[in-house]
């Protein structure tokens, strides 16, 4: 793949969406609201634990993982939500993984994909997602707002992902309640945890904020803990010798 990761991925998503049909709505899976949970549990840094077999930057990470066992370990050790990669081409995920995991855990599940169309949102909801991801860099603001409103009208929560100040301002403008700061540049796929620290100076009171990517150790987590409600962690958990211990290590006590 070229260095321009995001445009390449979005081109592929356009092809995939053209082949999707709009599914009939199935009942929304019942669990707690992530926003409410993060607002009311601020004594520690909450973990969004990810099931991810591969990525464009890392290549194969853990192809042989038992996805349900991994998800259950996350849940048993206090994860606030499980993020499930559903992108097939670039992350070796699958919508079926979301279906499997969602039937086996009680906590919220995030459909982690590059969503550009309502059909993807309905498919994710029907597969058991209670939260979807919308990436500011992937969509014009008006379209982002349309998809955000569509998702919330279906009872879903939305993690709105940003990477820089203009994108954070967009997330604030559309009224996002759950905002992610991705420490990974989606054009180059390079990471810098300082992205989270720099943007945290522009946070508002109402939303909750999640730091994403480039968090591997308790020391990394401690850097962002004073400013964020939670962190999204994939690679560090998928490669850990002791997954339970790694989840606990990242749950920084905020007092």
From Swiss-Prot:
Organism classification: Bacteria, Bacillati, Bacillota, Bacilli, Lactobacillales
- Name of the encoding gene: trpC
Matching entries from InterPro entries are given as: Aldolase_TIM, Indole-3-glycerol_P_synth, Indole-3-glycerol_P_synth_dom, Indole-3-GlycerolPSynthase_CS, RibuloseP-bd_barrel
| EC code(s) of this entry | 4.1.1.48
Catalytic reaction equation(s): 1-(2-carboxyphenylamino)-1-deoxy-D-ribulose 5-phosphate + H(+) = (1S,2R)-1-C-(indol-3-yl)glycerol 3-phosphate + CO2 + H2O
Q: What class of enzyme is it?
A: lyase
- CDD domains (alphabetical): IGPS (cd00331)
What is the official name of this protein in its record?
Indole-3-glycerol phosphate synthase
In which family does this protein belong, per the annotation?
A: Belongs to the TrpC family.
User: What biological process terms from GO does the record include?
Assistant: L-tryptophan biosynthetic process
